[in-house]
C-alpha cells in the first residue's frame, strides 16, 4: 500500500481537455491576453512613476495593484501555455502555490485600502493630504505585501504534511489547492475547514472596509446638488468599484466554500476569470474611465513619437 503513496512536491498538470487543434487556438487566445496584460499593467506602472500629475496615493496604490496583476498572471499563464503546447507539464508545489495565493491576498488588501482612500478623498477632502500622506501609503503597502506572504506559511506547511498518490496527476492548469487536497491520501477535512476560515477572513475582512467606504461615498455623493458634480464624484471610484465586483465576485465563488475539492471544471472556469481575464481587463478599466490617466498616456505617446522623430 505504501508504494502507491508519496509526499510529493511536484505534480503533472493535465490542463485542458480537447484536441491538439483546440489547444493551439486556446494557446493563441491566452498568449494574446498575457501580452496585453503585461503591456497594459507595465504602462500603468511607468506613467505613474514618471508623470507628476499621477503622484497621488490613488495612483501609487494602482501601480502596486498593477504589479500584483503582472505577478499573478505570470505565475499561472506561462505554465498554462506550456501545457497547451506540450499536453501537460510538471510544476513544483511550494513555489507556485505560495506565490499565487500570496499575491491574491495582497491584491485584496490593496483593494480594501484603495476603497478607504476613495472614501477619504470624497468624504473628507480637506484632510485628504494629511490622512493619506506618503508615510502612511508606504507603510500600508509594506504591510499588505508582508501580510500576503505570511498568510501562506501555515497552508504551505499543512499541505507538505500530506501524502499524495504516486501518479501526481492534477486535473487543472495550475496547482489549485482544492485539487491538491483531492489527491491526498490523508483526511483533509480539518485543513479544508481552516483554509475556508482563512479565505473568509481574507476576502470578507477586506470586503467590509470596502462596503463601509462605498456606503459613505454614495451617501455623500447623493447629497451633491448638481448632476455634473455627482458624475464627477462617481467617476473617481467607478473603475475601482468595477475591479472590486469582478475580483471579489469570482474569488468568493472560487475560495469561500467549505468543500474545496468539488467542481473541477467549475474551478477551472472561475480560475481563468481570476488569473487571465481580470488582469487583462484592469488596465482598460482604470484607463478608459480616468481622464488623468488618459491625458498622461497621450502625453507619453507624444513624447515617444517626438523622440523617435529626433
Swiss-Prot record:
Top-level lineage group: Eukaryota
Intervals, Extracellular compartment: 1-24, 75-98, 157-193, 255-267
GO molecular function, one term: olfactory receptor activity
Transmembrane segments: 25-45, 54-74, 136-156, 194-213, 234-254, 268-288
Compartments in which it is found: Cell membrane
Listed Pfam families: 7tm_4
SUPFAM superfamilies found in the cross-reference section: Family A G protein-coupled receptor-like
Keywords: Cell membrane, G-protein coupled receptor, Glycoprotein, Membrane, Olfaction, Receptor, Sensory transduction, Transducer, Transmembrane, Transmembrane helix
Keyword Membrane: yes
Cytoplasmic side: 46-53, 117-135, 214-233, 289-310
Entry's Gene Ontology cellular component terms: plasma membrane
InterPro entries (alphabetical): GPCR_Rhodpsn (IPR000276), GPCR_Rhodpsn_7TM (IPR017452), Olfact_rcpt (IPR000725), Olfact_rcpt_6C-like (IPR047132)
Membrane topology, as annotated: Multi-pass membrane protein
Signal peptide span: none
Main location: membrane
Positions annotated as glycosylated: 4
Function statement: Odorant receptor.
Protein family membership: Belongs to the G-protein coupled receptor 1 family.
Protein name from the UniProt record: Olfactory receptor 9A2
Species this chain originates from: Homo sapiens (Human)
Lineage, highest ranks first: Eukaryota, Metazoa, Chordata, Craniata, Vertebrata
